[in-house]
Every structure is written in C-alpha cells, then in structure tokens.
Swiss-Prot record:
Annotated source species: Trametes hirsuta (White-rot fungus)
Enzyme kind, highest EC tier: transferase
InterPro entries for the chain: Asp/Orn_carbamoyltranf_P-bd, Asp/Orn_carbamoylTrfase, Asp/Orn_carbamoylTrfase_sf, Asp_carbamoyltransf_Asp/Orn-bd, Orn/put_carbamltrans
Binding site for L-ornithine: 212, 276, 280-281
UniProt-recorded name of the protein: Ornithine carbamoyltransferase, mitochondrial
Keyword Transit peptide applies: yes
Recorded family membership: Belongs to the aspartate/ornithine carbamoyltransferase superfamily. OTCase family.
One matching Pfam family: OTCace
EC assignment: 2.1.3.3
Catalytic reaction(s) noted: carbamoyl phosphate + L-ornithine = L-citrulline + phosphate + H(+)
Length: 375
C-alpha cells in the first residue's frame, strides 16, 4: 500500500477516536491468538504432551516488520515495556534496537532534532520512553518515521490499551452474557478475526496519584461508555495538570468523571478498582511526604467493602507494585487481573507496531468502522 505523506505519531489515546481504539484492541486479540501457537513447543497441543519435530503448519502472524528495525529509545528503566517491545518486534519479523540512558542522552551530547533525524534515517520506527513529555513531542516533530509513546510524564497509552484488552477478554466477569466466544481449534490458528466480548458500561475507580496511566484513562474510559471515579489527595500535584484536563474537557470526558479526596467515596459501586505507584521514578526524594499524603489509600477488601464497591469488583495495577498501594490479599487474590493485564502489554504493543510502524495505517484513515482484518 502507498505510505501516507504525513508521518503518523501516537502520543496519547486522546489522539485516537473510539473506533481506532477498538480497532487496536481487536487487532491485538487477533495477533495474540495467531502468535501464541508459535510460542508453544511444537506438537504440545493434541499430542499427549509429547514434543514433535514436525514443522509448524500454522500461518505466521503478520510480518509487517520484516527487515525493519525499531529503535527503543528509553531514558527510564523498564521491564514490561522493554520485554513487550522486543518480543513483539521479533514476532512481526523485525528487530528492536535498545538505546538506553547510557547509550544516548537526548539533548545532551546531541540535540533532539539531530538525534531524531539520525535515528529515523536508520530505523523504521521509534518507541520512546522519556521523562518530560516535551522530549517526545520534540522527537516526533523532527522524526521522519513514526514515534510511539512508550511512557512520558503526561501519558502512558500502551498501558491503558492493555487494560482495555484485558477487560474485553474477561467481559464475562462483569456480565456472563458478554463472554468472548471460544474459537474452535481450527479457527484459533487461522487468520480469521474473532469478535471480542462486549464490555458493559463499568464504574471504574482509580485510587492514588494522578500520573500518566490515569491521564490516559481520563481521556479514554468515558469515551468507551465507562464512568471514572478518582480519589487523590487535595493537593494540586496529585491532580491532573492543565494540559491533561484541557484534553479531557475537549473530548467531553469530564461529564463522566467524579473526583474526590475520599477513597471510600471513589469505590462506591465500582466494578473495577485501579491503582498505580505512589512514587514514580524521579520522585524518590518525596517518598516520606508521599507516604504520609496517601495514608488510607491502600486498596484492601475492607476499603472496598466499606465504600460499597460491587461485590464482584476486580483489581488492576500497572506494576511495579509496592505493598503500601495494595495489600497481598487483593493483589494475589481472585479479584486481581494484574498479571493478565501485564501479559497483554505485549499484544497491544505488537498491534501498534504492526499498524503504526509496519503499515502506517493506524492514523492514515479513521478507525471508525474500519475492518482490521483487511490489513
């Protein structure tokens, strides 16, 4: 297909329509189903547990990154994002090149515009995990190839996409009639798209700091029909900054957001309870004050019971987790979707790599009603 003359970048889910977001989720699920059999030992399924040397008879997932290189430009430490990106690029036939803080320092040894042009001249996509959001905006401004936000001070789009995929896969937990259909053995290994379970409108409670994950939730969940109830201390540094709130209002999401300083009020009627780290990278010097400010915000069974959460409420955390944020009973208990959510980071990043870096099709046309299977 002919490439767009305008380079597509993705900084936040606020840049996408609900249809485009759903397209990514559907494509993520499709890639997950078609790629997973390739990751299992050959002959394991249906062979009585015995291994086989027979070649795979399954079709490979999309190879849109064949012979292409993706630069992972990470100025912050990473476990899940880096692993997801490197394995996703490999499954798409490409190569991920990791450039850490010690390898390249944006704006220190070389200006950001120069770095963007150099990296973009050698790679076909840039996946950047930066500090201040202005860094990735400048990178995108001068890059000749697509730039995808792996994390910045303001936004974390790939995390929220993984959360949404997890909700769709577990839709039956919220409404038994919404279960995703189980594909047959033949369909599971085909290139045929399987419809995901529809997630009914949920009440989502977020308890904790207003950071990048919450910011992308604020501009996404209300547009997908969910109510968002947020609890954070009454201090401006724990509330959404103006740049984020302006996007919230612009998209009309503020009408479905309730903000309070009382975590019990936030979890009232909650189907899903979400929290995040209270102390992000670079905030270590504030640890003592932050622990004091967030006293009483730990997600526990007692807090959710006293606040009146839905009896079947579920829990998510983007990781890494500290026990101050959520106790072991919830984190490791049957309510937790944490590790399913973590696993889905790989598949949503793989979908973004395929659509944004491989095909330049994510933003080249409106995702409303687009058939992802036609790619």
């Amino acid at each position: 297909m002919a490439l767009s003359t305008k380079v597509p970048h993705l900084m936040t889910l606020a840049d996408l329509t609900p249809g485009q977001i759903q397209r990514i989720i559907t494509h993520s699920y499709h890639l997950k189903r078609t790629a997973q059999p390739w990751l299992a030992p050959q002959g394991r399924a249906g062979s009585g547990g015995k291994y086989s040397n027979a070649p795979h008879k399954l079709r490979m997932p999309s190879q849109s990154l064949f012979s292409k290189s993706i630069a992972l430009l990470f100025s912050k430490r990473s476990t899940r994002t880096r692993l997801s990106a490197e394995t996703a690029a490999l499954l798409l036939g490409g190569q991920a090149l990791f450039l850490g803080r010690e390898d390249i320092q944006l704006g220190v040894n070389e200006t950001v515009p120069d770095s963007a042009r150099v990296i973009g001249g050698m790679c076909q996509g840039i996946f950047a995990r930066v500090g201040d959001h202005s860094e990735i905006e400048e990178l995108a401004r001068y890059s000749p190839v697509p730039v995808l936000n792996a994390l910045s001070s303001l936004w974390h789009p790939t995390q929220v996409l993984a959360d949404i995929l997890t909700l769709h896969e577990h839709a039956a937990l919220f409404d038994p009639a919404s279960a995703s259909p189980t594909p047959s053995a033949a369909d599971a290994f085909s290139q045929k798209y399987t419809k995901l379970g529809e997630v009914r409108p949920l009440t989502v409670a977020y308890v904790g700091d207003s950071a990048n994950v919450l910011h992308d939730m604020l501009v996404t969940y209300p547009r997908l029909g969910h109510q968002l109830r947020v609890a954070s201390p009454e201090n401006d540094k724990y509330r959404a900054p103006k740049a984020v709130w302006d996007r919230v209002v612009e998209l009309g999401c503020d009408k479905n957001i309730f903000w309070t300083a009382d975590p019990r009020a936030a979890v009232k009627g909650a189907d899903l309870v979400v929290t995040d780290t209270w102390i992000s990278m670079g905030q270590e010097a504030e640890k003592a004050q932050r622990l004091k400010d967030f006293a009483g915000y730990q997600v526990t069974e007692a807090l959710c019971r006293e606040g009146g959460a839905n009896p079947d409420w579920k829990f998510m955390h983007c990781l890494p987790r500290k026990q101050d944020e959520v106790d072991d009973e919830v984190f490791y208990g049957p309510r937790s979707l944490v590790f399913q959510e973590s696993d889905n980071r790989k598949w949503t990043i793989m979908a973004l790599f395929d659509l944004l870096f491989g095909k330049w099709s994510l933003l080249a046309r409106n995702g409303e009603g687009a058939d992802a299977g036609s790619e």
